[in-house]
Amino acid sequence: MTDYAAEFKTKRMVYIPDALDINSANELNDEIHSLSMEGKGTSDEQCPISHSFYNPPKCKQALVKMVEPLSKLLNIDLDYSYCYARLYLPGEVLKPHIDRESCEISATMTLGYYGPDVWPIYMGEHNMDTKGNKINIGIGDMLMYHGTELRHWREKFEGVWQTQLFFHFIDKNGPYAEHAQDKKVVWSEESVEVDGEDYRQKWKQLTKSRTSTPNN
């Protein structure tokens, strides 16, 4: 039996299979595709080809529900920061980066994909690692990692689409405790109900008010 807490403490990352059952993953995947078709996604600076979503409602509900079980699994007193989803599209590249403070402890989960195989992520062993470990994340599986410490990236996407969900947490007893709930940013729940242009304008206003854009 895997000791997730020990592995996460030692390696600063851990792979958790079946974090969501397939039906739940499909439901969240459907939410992201529906929002995309309604024009409620945005193009961020990090992945301009793809459609991105800050705190989509059903995904955020899943994020909040994850806090208690993940806290027990990792033996860390977590609080949620925010969730972020991307519908990755052909030609996208995720450049090597580490994450901002609100992403101290992060998880990336594949919700669905269309292509020959799932699009892998490369996870470095520290913030300067340029080689990294190639990791294929199955649908409903979760890779947790210290986002502010480990450099991560994805090479050029050759598939048709892939839906990725990111859960971001902070350690209540750590250096970034003040970033709980992403410093209380809460506009997104209502923004997903307005037209696409208003969504994009709200997103631009939000990112301009921060020192950096979301990193995933």
Ranges and model annotations:
Residues 1-74:
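Non-heme Fe(II)/2-oxoglutarate
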Residues 7-10, 79, 161:
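A short, polar/charged loop/turn motif at coil->beta-strand junctions and beta-hairpin connectors
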Residues 17, 155, 168:
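Residue-level detector of conserved, well-ordered beta-strand and adjacent loop positions
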Residues 51-52, 60-120:
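Conserved double-stranded beta-helix
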Residues 86, 158-159:
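A short beta-turn/loop motif at secondary-structure boundaries
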Residues 90-149, 161-165, 170-185:
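Catalytic core of non-heme Fe(II) oxygenases with the double-stranded beta-helix
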Residues 151-158:
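Short, Lys/Arg- and Gly-enriched loop/turn segments at beta-strand edges
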Residues 161-216:
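Double-stranded beta-helix
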